[in-house]
A protein has these predicted regions:
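Soluble or luminal CAZymes and related metallo-dependent hydrolases
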Residues: 16, 23-27, 96-99
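Alpha-helix capping at helix-to-loop junctions
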Residues: 106-113, 143, 157
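Short, contiguous alpha-helical
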Residues: 2-7, 21-25, 29-35, 40-83, ...
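Helix-adjacent hinge/juxtasegments
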Residues: 70-107
Length: 165
């Protein structure tokens, strides 16, 4: 794919949409393994230094990823929802995580390459481009996973290797 820049020069694509989704899904698979590594009670209650429990961070990630990609693909805005019924069961969170992964995959293929440069207001609140929104989704997940690594280590649990995506 070639893009013509404003000054008339051509730019070649650095990463394809397929490469980007594969990269993100590698991160999501790693985050799933981090969720699995937590003892049930600690997943919902363990905190350090005023940070939220990892379960709350995962609720945020669930509220952003699947619904965000769906909004980008369909153009239909929905309010940001970071609260999901889980009954304090890690198995339910993992089920929701897998559903979100499927939702991302379903809607990702509907995003046309030219859409990545479009300006949007995701969830009716956050302005940027499609690609900057997706980068935020990924960066936010990495950020919260890093917090979870600190939690796991404080519990005496070796987290999954960060590079095994």
């Amino acid at each position: 794919m070639e893009t013509t820049l404003n000054n008339g020069t051509k730019s070649h694509e650095v990463i394809t949409p397929t490469d980007l989704i594969n990269h993100w899904q590698g991160h999501r698979a790693l985050t799933r393994r981090v969720i699995e590594a937590f003892p049930e009670e600690a997943f919902f209650n363990h905190t350090i230094g005023g940070m939220r429990p990892f379960s709350d961070m995962v609720m945020e990630l669930l509220g952003i990823a699947g619904p965000g990609i769906k909004e980008i693909a369909t153009g239909k805005q929905a309010p940001l929802n970071e609260h999901f019924e889980h009954g304090n069961k890690k198995a339910k969170i993992l089920e929701l995580w897998d559903e979100a992964t499927n939702e991302i995959n379903t809607y990702w293929v509907q995003i046309k390459p030219e859409q990545f440069q479009q300006h949007i207001k995701i969830f009716g609140q956050y302005e940027g481009t499609v690609y900057s929104s997706i980068f935020y989704f990924i960066d936010n997940e990495i950020h919260h996973r890093g917090q979870a690594y600190v939690y796991l280590r404080s519990l005496g649990i070796e987290p999954p290797a960060f590079y095994e995506r």
